[in-house]
Amino acid sequence: MYNLRDAAGETQQDVADGLNRLGVARGKRLAVTANQVSRWERGITYPSALYRQLLAEHFGVSVQDLGLTRQRVTPQQRDSPENDSGGFAIYQDPASHPQAEDSQEEWRAVRRKLNIHRVQLAREAARLYDVEQRVGDSGLIAASQWLLSTPIELARFGIGLAPEGTAPLVTGTEDAAAGVRPLASDGRRHQRYSLALRDVEQPRLFENRLAWHLAGVDWSQPDRALTFTTGTYFGGVDVSEALAHEMAMYHVAGDGSGILPASWRNLGFRRLVGDPFTPSRRPTAPSTDTLTLRVDDDGASFVLHNRAAGNVAVAGGMLHIMPAGVFQPSSVLPAAQVADFDLWRNMMREYSEEFLGSAEHGGDGEPADYSAEPLGAFDRALASGGVRVFCLGVALDALTLWGEILTVAVFDGPTYDHLFADMVDSNAEGTVVKTGRVRPTSALPFTRHTIDELTASGRLAPAAAGCLELAWENRRTILGRS
């Protein structure tokens, strides 16, 4: 792709502008940036099918001629400290080890079943825990006092770093998790689930970055209601997706047609994890999940995100509230680890990426500049009262035991329309859901009927289902209406 651009005498910005124009011609509002083009050229991220088609059209070549390849695990990657894996393994094609080929194909088949049935599996996994811990039928579970009886605004509580203690007891490398990790090309079993994902079936967006892990929840301590430790994204995936894979192995019918009743039998890794509400026992990566409400005199509406299973490792193939993203710094630089340790700033970056199509702060560049647009505009809207942000509490996805920080952002109509005048139809993680044949709209009415229909569809992510239900129960507080 670099050679094609060089031969055309174009800059990365020229290519980005060209793709955006082609998107408009197709009726799609895109926001490709030069940084995004650079990451494609370097193989850091892999463009979606739409972007591959547009790139081919822009350069006047076939998709195959673009020369794009997914990242493949190399010996250096296998032995890097980032992956915590020891030993040096020379890469071999799976065909050179028939058992590895069979193991990986079987593993892919379970992943396919998992992504098809994530919602149903989460609801069934919730039945493994006490009924008092289940958040309705959402597929979420929460400890006593983790959910707030009355939503509180983000500014009314603080977060903090837990003292550095012992390393997590469960990391996903244990023998109890071996059955969910396929054989590697050399015939040895992958040491971590994240390495198996990257080696066998890498999602388009899959990079190991710094991430904060949930350590504790205590709403009686408003200055440090939520505490975290510093870890990595892959550390969370190693446990969460291993748990999900194990559940899919034993609870999806053999023909993939349905879900079997929940049972602890064969769930050796889940038993090893133990009490899910002791998050420091394992690397518990959390996401900020935000229900975005636009409110005017006619009522309230919200938007949903159709997350592409081939693009993301977590919550793929489901309808989710937006924005949602892992709680992590924008850069590996020390300054970002201080400035970005803030839930609202995490949400702002996700708004910029998911609503406006801005390039993701991939962790390998400069820290986010919160005075620059559009981030500065979000801060001004919060300060002026054009948006109010509430926290509903914290829960866990019962399937993965991934942390979910449930929030609601309430925008007045003019503020929403100004901030999101250039809202995109698709982004790196999926597409914005639209309804209506005559005049398609992304604005879904925030009503009991809409929530019930979405829940019955079986596609609503547990965090989305739980957030919508809790927001509806607390709508008078959130909307400020009687």
Model-flagged regions — what are they?
Residues 1-4, 17-18, 30-88:
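Short amphipathic recognition helices of helix-turn-helix/homeodomain-type DNA-binding modules
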Residues 13-28:
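DNA-recognition alpha helix
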Residues 298-364:
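Conserved Nudix-box catalytic region and its N-terminal flanking loop in Nudix hydrolases
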